[in-house]
């Protein structure tokens, strides 16, 4: 059984998430708020986009808004709660998926939107996704995703799993793409290889790794980088859709 503190925290967070849909609970008189919760969330998102999730704190967001740190607690109770609000706001940025598109394109759009969101807001990869409390933004996105594939005529469980597989694939690829982008801001891949390539060539014998040497030579010349997240995403998504569609649109 949850303790009273956990229940109260849940009520507070859900009230913040659904603040437009659910009337605020009556409470005591407190300090007058000079900005909106929306403004706090927007400031936190801008800060995370610019400086990274680690730099987001109640104090830092308050500074962005020209407020005293303690006053921000009248809007959000903690950084954890703020992160949930941030993720929910970002989820509402997805465009609708056109229903007239072929089913394969609609499924691909689910994965592409999930990846694009993470590339635009890489700090989302640092927000714990398990038990992330649902708000209207994430629920509207889920509704849009379900609407995009509802005509495959399959069970509710399969609809949910199709979306989960597509978004989890996109998340894994986005994580690699974000890592590559961060690394190349410090040193280009060509500069990195100039240092490590000759040393690795001296340590690794092609005779000991004939297949890896053959494939590595070809892809190294093609990618001019340790990998190709964009190409891997397109290839992997197509293979994933090849596997999903026969089971989804069969008789």
Report the location of each language-model feature.
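Short, amphipathic alpha-helical "lid/cap" segments that border enzyme active or binding sites
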Residues: 41, 104, 230-241
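N-terminal intrinsically disordered/low-complexity leader segments
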Residues: 1-34, 209-220
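Hydrophobic alpha-helical bundle segments that form small-molecule/ligand-binding pockets
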Residues: 141-198, 244-247
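Solvent-exposed, amphipathic alpha-helical segments
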Residues: 43-51, 89, 93, 99, ...
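Alpha-helical structural segments
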Residues: 39-46, 81-96, 109-113, 140-147
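Amphipathic C-terminal alpha-helical segment
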Residues: 168-185, 202-226, 242-250
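Hydrophobic alpha-helical connector segments
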Residues: 95-140, 156-159, 163-166
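Helix-turn-helix
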Residues: 39, 43, 47-81, 85
């Amino acid at each position: 059984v949850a303790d009273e503190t956990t229940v109260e925290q849940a009520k507070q967070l859900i009230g913040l998430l659904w603040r437009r849909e659910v009337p605020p609970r009556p409470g005591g008189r407190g300090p007058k708020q000079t900005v909106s919760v929306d403004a706090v969330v927007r400031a936190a998102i801008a800060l995370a986009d610019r400086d990274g999730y680690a730099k987001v704190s109640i104090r830092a967001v308050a500074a962005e808004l020209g407020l005293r740190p303690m006053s921000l607690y009248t809007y959000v109770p903690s950084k954890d709660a703020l992160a949930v609000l941030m993720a929910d706001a970002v989820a509402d940025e997805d465009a609708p998926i056109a229903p007239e598109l072929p089913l394969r394109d609609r499924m691909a759009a689910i994965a592409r939107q999930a990846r694009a969101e993470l590339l635009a807001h890489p700090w989302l990869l640092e927000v714990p996704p398990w038990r992330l409390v649902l708000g209207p933004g994430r629920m509207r996105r889920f509704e849009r995703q379900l609407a995009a594939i509802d005509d495959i005529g399959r069970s509710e469980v399969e609809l949910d799993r199709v979306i989960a597989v597509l978004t989890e694939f996109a998340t894994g690829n986005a994580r690699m793409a974000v890592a590559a982008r961060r690394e190349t801001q410090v040193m280009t891949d060509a500069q990195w290889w100039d240092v490590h390539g000759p040393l690795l060539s001296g340590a690794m014998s092609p005779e000991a790794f004939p297949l890896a040497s053959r494939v590595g030579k070809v892809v190294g010349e093609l990618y001019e980088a340790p990998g190709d997240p964009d190409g891997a995403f397109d290839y992997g998504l197509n293979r994933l859709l090849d596997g999903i569609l026969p089971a989804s649109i069969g008789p």
